[in-house]
A protein has these predicted regions:
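N-terminal and secondary-structure boundary signal
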Residues: 1-287
Length: 287
């Protein structure tokens, strides 16, 4: 797991990808590369809920400078908000025009029923058509799962009907099973100013950090460590490990910082999310 600190998010991202030698992981320059941000709702990234467009710009520039051209940004906002509005408000419409890449609204996509390790789930066809998937989640809290990062961000690649179904089944098991088919090839985590309490933002905690990883299970295990949770408190992580998605053995993680952090950030041991979670009554919510 690599990390970098600073304020120039685009250049930080490019340096992080150079350090990770991302281009050596992509099999062919003709590969269709999908970039999956978190645009849960139409709110600017500074609010603490959505992926900073500067990070996506850094990924696109890094790839285009190495002659990768077949790229697409794909996402589906949560039920109740329109992805098209999120693309506009979050700066992705202008980003796509600037770099000449396609935007795919997975809320409007066709789907295929897939066998996800014994669980049938509807998955968007645009995601299934990818050769290489770069996941760009926001490190933040969640009122039901405590944390949301790499594994849960794949939920934006299923239709709204399936999102509701996830909640009817209980989030943890379907999130884990989804990741047996939607395999993340590389992860760039927006740890700039995520809301550590709620998935829709409003209380951003400025950390000015970006992470990179290849294993979504190990990535989310590290996120639990950062936010003072035990891995067992986020059941989908261990379920995903048992399904062969990745490793939750944090003792095997190799952490490397690309630069020094100028200011330390205190993460409270007890936060609002812990108090709220027990009071949440889930009725087909879809975040």
């Amino acid at each position: 797991i690599l990390m970098i600190h600073g304020k120039d998010y685009k250049e930080m991202t490019k340096r992080l990808l150079r350090e990770a030698e991302l281009d050596t992981r992509i099999p062919d320059r003709r590969c269709r590369i999908g970039i999956k941000p978190n645009l849960v709702s139409p709110t600017e990234a500074s609010y603490g809920a959505t992926t900073h467009p500067e990070i996506i710009a850094g990924i696109l520039e890094y790839l285009q400078e190495r002659n990768y051209e077949n790229m697409v940004i794909l996402e589906g906002s949560w039920v109740g908000d329109r992805t098209a509005e999120a693309f506009q408000v979050c700066g992705y419409d202008s980003l796509a025009k600037q770099y000449g890449v396609e935007l795919v609204d997975t809320q409007k996509d066709s789907t295929t029923s897939c066998d996800c390790a014994g669980m049938k789930l509807q998955i968007c066809d645009s995601a299934l058509a990818l050769d290489f998937l770069i996941n760009v989640p926001v490190l933040k809290g969640h009122c039901q799962t405590k944390v949301t990062c790499a594994l849960k961000n794949m939920k934006g690649l299923i239709p709204n009907k399936e999102k509701r179904h996830f909640h009817a089944m209980g989030l943890h098991k379907p999130i884990a099973h989804l990741n047996t088919v939607l395999r993340q090839d590389f992860i760039v985590v927006d740890n700039i100013c995520g809301d550590l309490d709620f998935e829709d933002g409003g209380n951003p905690v400025v950390m000015d950090r970006i992470l990179a990883a290849a294993d979504p299970v190990l990535c989310d295990t590290y996120v639990c460590h950062l936010l003072n949770y035990e891995t067992e408190e986020v059941p989908y992580i261990k379920i995903a490990e048992k399904l062969g998605v990745g490793s939750a053995d944090f003792s095997k993680a190799v952490l490397r910082a690309c630069n020094e952090q100028e200011h330390s950030v205190h993460v409270p041991v007890k936060r609002k999310i812990v108090e709220l979670q027990d009071a949440v009554e889930e009725v087909e919510s879809c975040s």
